[in-house]
A protein has these predicted regions:
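Conserved acidic, metal-coordinating active-site core of Asp-based
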Residues: 118-218, 231
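Short, hydrophobic/glycine-enriched beta-strand segments
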Residues: 6-12, 44
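Active-site phosphate-binding/coordination module
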Residues: 27-123
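Well-ordered, non-membrane alpha-helical segments in soluble/globular domains
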Residues: 26, 98-109, 140-164, 268-272
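Mg2+-dependent phosphoryl-transfer enzymes with acidic/Ser/Thr/Gly-rich catalytic loops
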Residues: 2-7, 25, 190, 197-280
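A short acidic (Asp/Glu
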Residues: 53-57, 129-133, 227-232, 254
Length: 280
């Protein structure tokens, strides 16, 4: 088997799934299927759960005729869980699973914050609350900041070592093994060792097990943390183009190419970029 001309590492929320509706546009699925059918390897590198990715991305691709040998893998919960489209078996790293008190705290807090968010109970390793789709972003953002403050207070009261952005609150041993990570539509409690770089390494291992690896990659994301995918691949000596679909626009000064889709953001930009990769 010859090495494919390029591979894809895709964040899901934003580049693939709409942050507003949490659904995937049909044309994007069609183009992704075409790329997979032509042997392009694809890794979905996301904070989403395997349940979400299997239902919203993999199942619709299967309905469209996903080939049995398609090289499609999902690394979820920022590297803590993963699944391959071929067998559907979900794997999890127990060392990246948050303590039960994190889930218990979310269930307690949601009683006061259910007007703006809900608990994502599909997560296997992380503990997550997500914005309700019927709540305006500015309302969710305000409530999220209040929630995050209460969450931090609860986790530190439970004597967990935790980090929120640049603030560190060590445990009795001086460690901060856990992280609160707010995003546009969610707040995650996760292992500090997790992240998009770990997801990229897991994705490479999954691809290496089913065929040759390309030496050129397109990574697509909507947050600054998604650049870690490109950093990881560039560090291997591969040719990388990172596509930033966020409203903020791309970073400058990276050692690899960074681009955007003029006039488009989120899933519209992701769909347009994937369409442009199709052979003419």
């Amino acid at each position: 088997m010859d090495a494919p001309p390029f591979g894809l590492f895709l964040d899901v929320d934003g580049p693939v799934s709409s942050p507003a509706t949490r659904t995937v546009p049909a044309p994007l699925l069609d183009d992704l299927l075409t790329l997979l059918a032509r042997g392009i390897p694809v890794v979905l590198n996301t904070g989403r759960s395997t349940d979400f990715v299997l239902a919203q991305v993999v199942a619709p691709l299967r309905d469209r005729g996903l080939p049995a040998g398609a090289r499609l893998h999902a690394v979820c919960e920022k590297g803590a869980t993963w699944v391959s489209a071929g067998d559907g078996r979900v794997h999890a790293d127990p060392e990246l699973t948050v303590p039960a008190v994190c889930h218990e705290l979310l269930e307690t807090l949601i009683a006061d914050y259910g007007d703006a968010m809900f608990v994502d109970r599909t997560k296997r390793a992380m503990a997550t609350v997500e914005a309700r789709t019927d709540v305006p972003p500015e309302v969710y953002g305000r409530r999220q900041r209040e929630f995050d403050a209460d969450l931090l207070a609860g986790l530190t009261a439970a004597r967990l070592g935790v980090r929120l952005r640049d603030q560190r609150f060590p445990d009795a041993d001086g460690r901060t093994p856990w992280r609160i990570d707010p995003s546009v539509i969610a707040t995650d409690v996760e292992a500090d060792a997790s992240g998009k770089a770990l997801g990229a390494r897991r994705g490479l291992a999954l691809l290496a097990a089913d065929g040759p690896l390309p030496r050129a990659w397109h990574t697509v994301g909507d947050s600054r943390s998604d650049y870690a995918m490109a950093d990881e691949l560039h560090g291997r000596g591969d040719d990388v183009t990172h596509v930033d679909v966020s409203p903020q626009g791309p970073l400058t000064g990276t050692p690899y190419a960074v681009t955007a889709v003029p006039g488009l953001v989120y899933e519209a930009a992701g769909a347009a970029y994937l369409s442009g990769l199709l052979p003419t």
